[in-house]
Amino acid sequence: MAEYSKVKSTKLMLKGIKNKSKKNKDKKRKREESDEDKLDIAGNWWSVKNFGEISGTVAIEMDKGAYIHALDNGLFTIGAPHKDDDDGPSPPEQFTAIKLSDSRVALKSGYGKYLGINSDGLVIGRSDAIGAREQWEPVFDTGKMALLASNSCFVGCNEEGDLVAQSKTAGEGEMIKIRSCAEREAKRDDDIPNEDKGNVKQCEINYVYV
């Protein structure tokens, strides 16, 4: 028995258990990837991730559930937060995005006026045409976004509750989300050409037409 006491104890390795740790790591990695791909949605409004997704009807969220709200006097403020996650922006919080270049857009309010800035950096919506002051540049960095005005300042809200572009740097108060209600293209799960999908007979027909 003395010989047995000198034997170094070790964990019993059973068949099929050896790669358990690796499998758990794979599952964790897949779960993290899935979380990254998960859409940030409020109602049917999803948060854009790049400039190419900005088009059509959009809303600009300044704080959780609180959107830029157009007033009938041509000014803008931050609307009351929508507490329900399924509640999207109201009509005064919806704008039409018009691409002007590979990095700039114009934004048109529901009152038919383009958003711009005055000489003091106050965001106003009183223009019937797009000029230099009605151009905006969404800036993306490490998963966050800010909106740069033509005066090279970022959009935020001042103490009076007015929307302004007066900050040369983008802090937490200048972080935004642009939400779109456009229908998203379904993500492809494979690289199989469309003509290769379907049964054999259908594939033959597809290639005949090709």
From Swiss-Prot:
Residues 1-37 are annotated as: Disordered. Gene3D superfamilies: 2.80.10.50. It is found in: Nucleus, Cajal body; Nucleus, Nucleolus; Cytoplasm; Cytoplasm, Myofibril, Sarcomere, Z line. Its main location: nucleus. GO terms for cellular component: Cajal body; catalytic step 2 spliceosome; nucleolus; striated muscle dense body; Z disc. GO terms for biological process: mRNA processing; muscle organ development; RNA splicing; rRNA processing. InterPro entries: Actin-crosslinking, FRG1. Pfam families: FRG1. It comes from the Eukaryota. Belongs to the FRG1 family. This is Protein FRG1. The lineage of its organism: Eukaryota, Metazoa, Chordata, Craniata, Vertebrata. The gene is frg1.
